Amino acid sequence: RQVGPGGHVIGVDMTPAMLAKAERNKARVGLDNIEFRQGFIEALPVADGSVDVILSNCVINLSPDKPAVFREAYRVLRPGGRLAASDMMTIGLFSPEERADLSAWAGCVSGAEDVADYVEAMRAAGFEDISVVDKAAPAEELAGQLPETGPARLFSARVTAVRR
């Protein structure tokens, strides 16, 4: 609905189960300008320069190859296209032991990247106008549930960037 009657939405997921669920939801709401494709965020099944906006909600941190994710996002975006993501990040680095403990708590948290490394990977892919905003309230709520950690801090971020 947000893209209007002339817009088109492509959803990508790596699992057939999530694609089937997405198709059921699409049928339930009666929209026909949405299509779903099976693929990985490191190798999107989308043509070069064919996308205006990429939205990602707590997925990039799950990838072990974040630079590849950002290169791929840059590849499929048109010039002037925007990437908007919500993701878990850290300020500082967790030790391998802390990451293992976090992984036991929630796999998505253990994949959180240091904000400086995350931004640098975006820059290296070619993105500009990169903004990272700490969504403090959710992070504070989450922090009380996480295992104790050293000097690193986990936070939930809203990230935006532009392909020029």
Where are the regions a protein language model picked out?
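Class I SAM-dependent methyltransferase SAM/SAH-binding core
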Residues: 1-44, 68
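Helix-to-beta-strand junctions that scaffold the AdoMet/dcAdoMet cofactor pocket
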Residues: 4, 62-64, 77-79
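Short conserved loop adjoining the S-adenosyl-L-methionine
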Residues: 43-48, 64
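Hydrophobic beta-strand segment of the Class I
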Residues: 54-55
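A short glycine-rich, Lys/Arg-flanked "PGG" loop and its adjoining helix->strand segment in the class I
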Residues: 67-82
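Short, glycine-/aromatic-enriched active-site segment of Class I SAM-dependent methyltransferases
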Residues: 89-109
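Short alpha-helix
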Residues: 110-132
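Core SAM-dependent methyltransferase catalytic element
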Residues: 125-128, 135-136, 141-164
